[in-house]
Swiss-Prot record:
GO biological process per UniProt: neuropeptide signaling pathway
Propeptide: 27-69, 70-105, 106-108, 144-153
The protein, known as: Neuromedin-S
Post-translational modification Asparagine amide, affected residues: N141
Source species taxonomy: Eukaryota, Metazoa, Chordata, Craniata, Vertebrata
The keyword Transmembrane helix belongs to this UniProt entry's keyword annotation: no
Functional description taken from the UniProt entry: Implicated in the regulation of circadian rhythms through autocrine and/or paracrine actions.
Name of the gene encoding the protein in the UniProt record: NMS
Amino acid sequence: MKHLRPQFPLILAIYCFCMLQIPSSGFPQPLADPSDGLDIVQLEQLAYCLSQWAPLSRQPKDNQDIYKRFLFHYSRTQEATHPVKTGFPPVHPLMHLAAKLANRRMKRILQRGSGTAAVDFTKKDHTATWGRPFFLFRPRNGRNIEDEAQIQW
């Protein structure tokens, strides 16, 4: 919706005055003089033009209020169509998996002192012939699993 330009009410007022067709000699004359030739119809037209000026001057504010109401109505969160678990905020299901993996990793770190973590996290597929522990994240800086095993912290 385009806003009206600020000079539009001024142009409307000039148009209304031009429509009155006031005969003059170039000098301003008082309107109270009955010899001007102004009749009631022309004065009513002038009053109508000026009465339309006020709503046009506040129209940008009305448009802004309508826009704010629209944003308020449509920016609210919609009600869920299915029940949502209260423990989790509404996120992608893979994000729930990432949280579970992080919990598992923390348990492994806590159990490291007891020596059971390596047993729980060994590869169990056909490619793992040695039963090496797998990493949730790959080793960095070009290190291998064997390099990690040799470094005893």
